Design a protein with these regions (language model features):
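The conserved SAM/SAH-binding core of class I Rossmann-like methyltransferase domains
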Residues: 56-58, 101, 125
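Cap/lid segment of the alpha/beta-hydrolase catalytic domain
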Residues: 62-78
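Conserved HGGG/HGGXW glycine-rich cap/lid loop of the alpha/beta-hydrolase fold
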Residues: 9-67
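Conserved alpha/beta-hydrolase "nucleophile elbow" surrounding the catalytic nucleophile
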Residues: 29, 96, 100-105
Length: 184
């Protein structure tokens, strides 16, 4: 595991596949996940390396082994998209394929809209059919992350996110801040 800096935050990432590959891909995970759970454990590192691509997977700010600010302003879509480009710059990668899952898809879409000239191909998965709908109930995810116990959470979807965050030993206050940020 290595780190790079974006907006003054230390963000963790893995590099895999041939270092001299002509093409690179950046993987961006979903909310309350991390690079290991979303990508490595599921076999993506090996599959990408087998295709001869140089791969990178970061832990988004507030997740995994990356910095975990508790300020919602640190989690704008634009800031998280800058993290993708900061990783590419750190690695000396001018252009890359970009694959995002769930929240990572929102980040990837923002990155592509910000600087499409640096993105070879964009793949978004787990986006959901409501990507263009108005935001859900304001603060519901944050409240689930801040609840003293999962039993205090009534909505099944929110309870499942809380259980997943607890299983991954994530910083729930950072996740609450992330959910309050302008990320979706």
């Amino acid at each position: 595991m290595a780190h790079f800096t974006s907006d003054g935050l230390a963000l963790a990432y893995d590099e895999f596949g041939p270092a001299d590959a002509r093409k690179a891909i950046v993987l961006v995970h979903g909310f309350s996940a991390n690079r290991y759970e979303n990508w490595k454990r599921m076999g993506w590192y090996d599959a990408i390396a087998a295709k001869g691509l140089r791969g990178f997977a970061l832990d988004n700010r507030g997740h995994g082994e990356s910095a975990k600010p508790h300020d919602p302003a640190q989690y704008s879509r634009e800031a998280m998209a800058r993290d993708v480009f900061a990783l590419m710059d750190h690695a000396g990668v001018e252009r890359a394929h970009l694959l995002g899952f769930s929240m990572g898809s929102h980040i990837a879409l923002t990155a592509a809209l910000t600087d499409s000239g640096r993105i070879d191909h964009l793949v978004v998965a787990g986006v959901g059919g409501k990507i263009f709908d108005p935001p859900r109930e304001e603060g519901a995810m944050a409240a689930a992350m801040e609840a003293a116990t999962p039993e205090e959470i009534s909505a099944p979807m929110l309870k499942s996110f809380r259980h997943f965050a607890d299983e991954q030993k994530e910083d729930r206050l950072a996740l609450a801040a992330c959910s309050r940020g302008d990320r979706m």
